[in-house]
Amino acid sequence: MPTPFVHLHTHTTYSLLDGATLLDPLIEHVRWLKQPAVAITDHGNLFGTIPFYTKARSAGIKPIIGCEVYMAKGSLLDKKPPEGPRDFYHLILLAQNSLGYQNLIRLVSHGYTEGFYYKPRIDKSLLRSHSSGLIALSGCLDGEIPTLLRQEQFASASVAAQDFLDIFGPDRFYLELQANGLHQQQRVNQGLIHVHRELGIPLVATNDCHYLKRGDADAHDLLLCIQTGTTITDTTRLRFGTDQLYVKSSEEMAEAFRELPQAITHTNLIAEQCTLEIPLHRTQLPRYNVPPPHTLDSFLETLAQQGLSARLAQHSGPLDQPKYERRLRTELLTICSMGFAGYFLIVWDIMKFARSRRIPVGPGRGSAAGSLVAYALGITELDPLAYDLLFERFLNPDRVSLPDIDMDFCMKRRQEVINYVTEKYGRDHVAQIITFGTLGAKAAIRDVGRVLDIPYDEVDTIAKLIPSQPNMTIAQALAEEPKLSALSASRPSVGNLLSVAGS
C-alpha cells in the first residue's frame, strides 16, 4: 500500500472562472481516496476558507488553509504596464497555525487594498514581515523559480530560491514538483532537483488541481474560454494543454514520483505541521464608546426611552402607552441580556449620521421592523405595535443568533456613510460583504453555446426550453421538459451542450 498522499495545491470554484471543483465533491472524493487531509489554495483569495474548513472537518478530513498568492516582481506599489506578459509570479502559502492564518489574512488583504493591479499582489518585503507560521511552496510553472528555470536563468533561480529560504527557513520552504504531462514541467522539475541538491531545499509533490477528475478536463477548458471571452476554436486562447490537473489518487502520485519518494512523504509531513484551529461562532462586535457615566446598556435604555417618548408625543388618536412601555422594557431586557446593546448603538449612530447629512434612508425592512427599540431609536420608521409585528422574529433569547438590521441608503451618497463608518471604527474594522455571481441554467447554456461556436439562434431556442423557476438545474429541466429531453436525445450536439453546461 503506498504512502498516503496529501494534495497541497488545489483550486476550487473560488478560483473564479479558473477552478472547476466544488467543495462538497472535493471533500467527498478525498475521503473516497482515503487521503487524510487536503489543502485549498485558490488564486489570490481566501473566499472558500470557512465553508471548506467546516465541511472538511465534518467529513473527518483535515483542512489545510492556503492561498496561491500573486508576487509582484518588484514592489507591490509599482503599478505600471508590465514589460512582459505579466508582472507577477505565483507562490503557494499554507497556514501552519493561528499566527500563520492571521499572517495569511494580512497578506491577502494587503494584496487587495495596497497591491491590486490587475491582480491582488504582494511582494517579498511584505512577505518577509508576515512569514511566521506559514509554509511556502515554490508554485506552478508561473512561480518565480520555475519561471527563471524555464528561461534558463539557472543562477537567478538559485538566488530566488535562497531568498525564499532566508524568509522561511529550511523547514518551511519547499520546491514544488509536478507530474502533469507538460514538457516544460519536466524540464523545470530537473532544474528544481538541481536547486534542491545545491541548496538543500526539500522537495514536495503537488498536482495543481483545477478540476476533480480527469474526465472534467474538457469542461474546465470551456471554463477558461468563458473567463477569457474566447471560443473553443480560437487557436491563440489560454489553455493548459494537459488533462492531468485533477485530484489524483495516492497510487497515481506515488507512481509519478517513484524515483523521489521523499516528495510524497513530505506532503504528509507538511500536513502534520498544519494544526490550525479556527475559532468559529465567536462574536466580536466593534466597541461603541458611550459618554460617562453610562454603560452600553444604560445609554441604550436612555436613548430608547427618550426616543419612544418623542414618537408617542407625535401620535394622534387613542394610545395604550403602558403597552408600549412594557414592550420597550421587554425588548431592552432581551437585547441587553444577550449583549447586543452596543450593536444597536452602532446602528443608531450610523442612521443618525445619515439623517444629519440629509442622506435619504429607507424606512426599514426585514425582521428588524418588529423591534420597538429600533423604532424608538429612529433606525426604522414602522411602529411594530400598530401592525402587530413580533420582536421574537428579530431577536429570540431561545435561539441565540446575531441580530440583522438592514439599512438602505441613497445609492449616490452611500459612500459617505461608508467613509464615516471607516473613519470612526478604523479601516481594519470595516469590510463590505461580497456577493458571488453564479451561472443559472439558462446563462450556462448560453455561455457554453457561445464557447462551442453554436449559432446564437439555436442556443437561444434551447435556453428558452429551460423552465423559469428559481434554482432550476439542467438535470431537473431535462426531467421536467419533454421537448428539451427529446432534443437532447435526438441531436448529439445538443446533448453535449447540455452535458457540459450542467457539469
Model-derived regions, located:
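Alpha-helical scaffold/interaction cores of sigma-54-like transcription cofactors
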Residues: M1-S503
